[in-house]
Amino acid sequence: MRCVVYSIAKSSPLELVNIYQKQCKRFDCELELVDLFPKNTANAQKVSKELAQKSYSLAFDPYLNPKAKNIALHPKAQRGDSFAFSKMLENHLNINFFIAGAYGFEENFLKDCQAWSLSEMTFSHEVAKIVLCEQIYRALSIIFKHPYHK
């Protein structure tokens, strides 16, 4: 299995992420984080919400894979517990997660993904990535019946 987390961000919280990357390898899952922050995104965020959202879509579009499970993290989307999250990931070999910038996703981008919410609360990118990585590991623990999830 391969899980890739794409985010509009300048950097990742490496220490904790590294821990979850190592733990996911136990389940033969490569967990990768890719931070994207093109120059046009920095400029677009200063102009308008619409331009910012468009720049996020342009940054993410090359990574949308019709053969993968594409999941956009969105605060108003479906949410569930860790067991529901594990069911969503089960039986997929390639999973791409997308975390938009401050202005969220364009509606058109969301049509190409399954939207999922980690919480009704807003998180910084760093916290969202850590929570997502932990939940990916927890989901793998559930799928493979490892006691971590209890």
What are these regions (language model features)?
Residues 1-27:
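N-terminal beta1-alpha1 ligand-phosphate binding loop
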Residues 2, 93-101:
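Loop/turn-to-beta-strand initiation segments
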Residues 6, 32-34, 116:
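General small-molecule cofactor/ligand-binding pocket signal
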Residues 104-108:
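Short, glycine/polar-rich helix-capping loops at beta-to-alpha or helix-loop-helix junctions
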Residues 109-150:
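Structured adenosyl-cofactor binding patch, chiefly the S-adenosyl-L-methionine
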